[in-house]
A protein has these predicted regions:
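Hydrophobic/aromatic residues positioned on beta-strands within the core alpha/beta folds
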Residues: 88-89
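Two-component/phosphorelay signaling modules centered on CheY-like receiver
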Residues: 18-36
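Non-catalytic signal-transmission and effector/linker regions of two-component phosphorelay proteins
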Residues: 1-12, 18-19, 25, 43, ...
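Acidic, metal-coordinating helix/loop segments flanking the phosphotransfer/catalytic sites
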Residues: 37-56
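Acidic catalytic/metal-coordinating carboxylates
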Residues: 40, 67-72
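Active-site residues of response regulator receiver
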Residues: 60-61
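Short loop/helix-cap segments at secondary-structure boundaries that form the rim of catalytic
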Residues: 94-102
Length: 125
């Protein structure tokens, strides 16, 4: 049962750097969202399969494992089309053409207020 005033959508943070991931999780939780976290694309896919309430993924590009964050974003778009996607990186600048349809790119370092605004905006639309 959802709490009054608490959004019903959950956000999945996918980031291999633990300190950055913890900061992003705190940011999104403080904005009032339920948050799941994964350190790799493989872990993210497992969480998406288990938790149908996940409505947005916020993923870093550079990650170890079978796929990076950009490949994960394309995979999610194909398998779970309604899930909103935000991709971030401090190393590469992605073009709109390289992102899956409807995904946003936010370069690191990002402003906390910018992230919470974009998450709210995407989940409202």
């Amino acid at each position: 049962m959802e709490e009054p005033g608490r959004p019903s959508a959950a956000v999945l943070i996918v980031e291999d750097e633990p300190l950055i991931r913890m900061g992003a999780v705190d940011l999104i939780e403080n904005a009032g969202f339920e948050v799941y976290e994964a350190g790799s694309a493989d872990a993210a896919i497992a969480l998406l399969e288990l938790h149908k309430e996940i409505r947005l993924i916020f993923t870093d590009v550079d990650m170890p494992g079978s796929m990076d964050g950009l490949k994960l974003a394309h995979y999610v778009r194909g398998r779970w089309p309604p899930v909103k996607i935000i991709v971030t990186s401090g190393h590469v600048k992605l073009t709109e053409e390289s992102l899956p349809g409807g995904a946003l790119f936010l370069p690191k370092p990002y402003e906390p207020a910018q992230i919470t605004h974009k998450v709210r905006e995407l989940l409202a639309g």
